[in-house]
Curated annotation (Swiss-Prot):
Belongs to the IncA family. Residues 1-19, 325-348 have a biased composition (Polar residues). Residues 243-298 form a coiled coil. Forms homodimers, and probably higher-order oligomers too. The chain crosses the membrane at residues 67-91, 97-117. This is Inclusion membrane protein A. One of its GO terms (cellular component) is host cell membrane. It comes from Chlamydia caviae (strain ATCC VR-813 / DSM 19441 / 03DC25 / GPIC). IncA proteins share the same general organization: a short N-terminal domain, a large bilobed hydrophobic domain, and a C-terminal cytoplasmic domain. Residues 54-118 are annotated as: Required for membrane anchoring. Its main location: secreted. It comes from the Bacteria. It is found in: Secreted; Host vacuole, Host pathogen-containing vacuole, Host pathogen-containing vacuole membrane. Residues 1-25, 320-355 are annotated as: Disordered.
Length: 355
């Protein structure tokens, strides 16, 4: 998210530096002096602050299919469990293929149910929220840095405005003294050059603006004729025009400073909003962690119940095997009892024939 852009405020500097060697011809330079101001834009920051945290979701059709499969698996697990309990209660014998099929259905259903429970936990949402919290922390740090930079720019612009005001005052005084002076210009020009040297420390842009005035001072040293004085007075008139441009520049800088202050307040509001959002997300993460712990306990209980169900199945299989062995023993005993009367009848019939 972009927090600052470079805005360039062009100021047209019209400074006339008369060259007295050309017999009163005015040397007019129209120069555009850009002043680079780092002004923040609040639209991108507001859009970033209003960005909602939404967990990654699946397509509606896939969600419905997964939900249907989970329901079918739960129903199958329940039906197989009920069937096993009914068979145990009635003591009916289950064939080996049917038993294997029931066990396979139970295992598959159990795996699907466990997967559904795992997918049902909001772990993905928790991870996404943690990433959002980290991003908000980085954004918060970056916004703090941007605010500090804006404050530094604000201080620098204020200092430049104060120095430009002083330059405006000195140039006005110089113009008044120049209009009133009709004698020696040596002291006046030396004072003027000294003032220009003091204002070179403001920056390269202001130094560029002062270059016409330096040419003017050099020209005043070369000649002091009446015609040169008149040309210089016309130059002072244009200097006043340039001073008006400086006044407009000062007004524009004041407007920029007010905008910077408003943007700094907006950054502070965004920082407070992000901190509040961070606290809410931390509370949500703690709640989700508690839910995950509860679901893990439920999973443990479900595993215990499945273990008990396997134990019941093992007992059922043992009981069925024991019942089958007892039934086979009873059938063999009944066959032996029926065979003994037949042998006795055959022996009686043989004795009757002999008699």
């Amino acid at each position: 998210m972009t927090v600052s852009t470079d805005n360039t405020s062009p100021v047209i500097s019209r400074a006339s530096s008369p060259t007295f060697g050309d017999h009163g011809k005015d040397f007019d330079n129209n120069k555009i002096i850009p002043i680079s101001i780092e002004a923040p834009t609040s639209s991108a920051a507001a859009v970033g602050a209003k960005t909602a945290i939404e967990p990654e979701g699946r397509s509606p059709l896939l969600q419905r299919i997964c939900y249907l499969v989970k329901i079918i698996a739960a129903i199958a697990l329940f039906v197989v469990g009920i069937a096993a309990l009914v068979c145990l209660y009635l003591g009916s014998v289950i064939s080996t293929p049917s038993l294997i099929l029931m066990l396979a259905i139970m295992l598959v259903s159990f795996v699907i149910v466990i997967t559904a429970i795992r997918d049902g936990t909001p772990s993905q949402v928790v991870r996404h929220m943690k990433q959002q919290i980290q991003q908000f922390g980085e954004e918060n740090t970056r916004l703090h840095t941007a605010v500090e930079n804006l404050k530094a720019v604000n201080v620098e612009l204020s200092e430049q405005i104060n120095q430009l005001k002083q330059l405006h005052t000195r140039l006005s005084d110089f113009g008044d003294r120049l209009e009133a002076n009709t004698g020696d210009f040596t002291a006046l020009i030396a004072d003027f050059q000294l003032s220009l040297e003091e204002f070179k420390s403001v920056g390269t842009k202001v130094e560029t603006m002062l270059s016409p005035f330096e040419k003017l001072a050099q020209s005043l040293k070369e000649t002091f004729s009446q015609e040169a004085v008149q040309a210089m007075m016309s130059s002072v008139t244009e200097l006043r025009t340039n001073l008006n441009a400086l006044k407009e520049l000062i007004t524009e800088n004041k407007t920029v400073i007010e905008q910077l202050k408003a943007d700094a307040q907006l950054r502070e509001e965004q920082v407070r909003f992000l901190e509040k959002r961070k606290q809410e997300l931390e509370e949500a993460c703690s709640t989700l962690s508690h839910s995950i712990a509860t679901l893990q306990e439920s999973t443990t209980l479900l595993k215990d119940s499945t273990t008990n169900l396997h134990a019941v199945e093992s007992r059922l299989i043992g009981v069925m095997v024991q019942d089958g062995a007892e039934s086979s023993t009873v059938e063999e005993a009944s066959q032996d009892d029926s065979a003994q009367p037949q042998d006795e009848n055959q022996s009686d019939a043989g004795e009757h024939k002999d008699s």
